[in-house]
Amino acid sequence: MLADMKVRRYIRLLFSYLLLAFMAVIIVYPLLWTAGASFNPGNSLISTSIIPKHPTFDHYKELFAGKESLQYVQWYVNSMKISLFTMAGSLLCVTFTAYAFSRFRFKGRKYALTLFLLLQMIPQFSALIALFVLAQILGMINSHWLLILLYIGGLIPMNTYLMKGYMDSIPMDLDESAKIDGASSTRIFFQIILPLSKPMAAVVAMNGFTGPLGDFVLSSTILRTPESYTLPVGLFNLVNDVMGASYTTFAAGALLISIPVAVIFIMLQKNFVSGLTAGGTKG
């Protein structure tokens, strides 16, 4: 009996490791292929390999050569601007909104939370025509600020629900003790609730940064001129030309997108992991 239990446990453990190894291959292999393609000479992917026989930095040099048809530096700056402002704006809006839902009781509170969940079920592309018409009416075609506001609005519902669940796990006794000492709701938020909510705030910040950085659908709808493009839109147009497509240069540009994401993740790694775990178990 004991031997059978050990065998079953060994089989489950072996299956778990095989599953993890399979998932690791699925995740890592495309990254290695992209990295290898960026160092391969030529523009085609047919003759590329993960380990280039004759590696070259020509594609990276081409990105920063300042060609009119390849404004990579400008696209990079645009993406960083949009992502950073979206991250800051969404973090501010989400924390304030979640605090209100977590600590105050008002009419329509439960309906608003339900509405937040329902909004997540509506596909983004279903509102593209309305958003484009709105941008035209406001005269904000090619406007990064309109794009930032749209991203912030899209991030608020789900992230607010996550943050609210985390704030609910913070004991109300802390608020009551602070109120006895004469602290206002604003002071309680900034000096007690917000510092204790840093783990989940890191998750919200990461979502706010990576979402706009990798978005193509909405940004391609609002941004129409090359100088206003973000990286996904600019790199797509780089390979959209059938005759002049440069897939290896695209690979080099795509690889560089991961640098700011990696930097932000490393900075927030400790809080990010604990906050993600807490968001799934608390509230």
From Swiss-Prot:
Molecular function as annotated in GO: ABC-type maltose transporter activity
Transmembrane segments: 13-33, 82-102, 115-135, 137-157, 188-208, 248-268
This protein's name: Galactooligosaccharides transport system permease protein GanQ
Signal peptide feature range: none
Keyword Cell cycle included in the entry's annotation: no
Gene3D superfamilies, A to Z: MetI-like
GO biological process: maltodextrin transmembrane transport; maltose transport
Alphabetically ordered keywords of this record: Cell membrane, Membrane, Sugar transport, Transmembrane, Transmembrane helix, Transport
Induction: Repressed by the transcriptional regulator GanR and induced by galactobiose. Also repressed by glucose.
Main location: membrane
Species assigned in the record: Bacillus subtilis (strain 168)
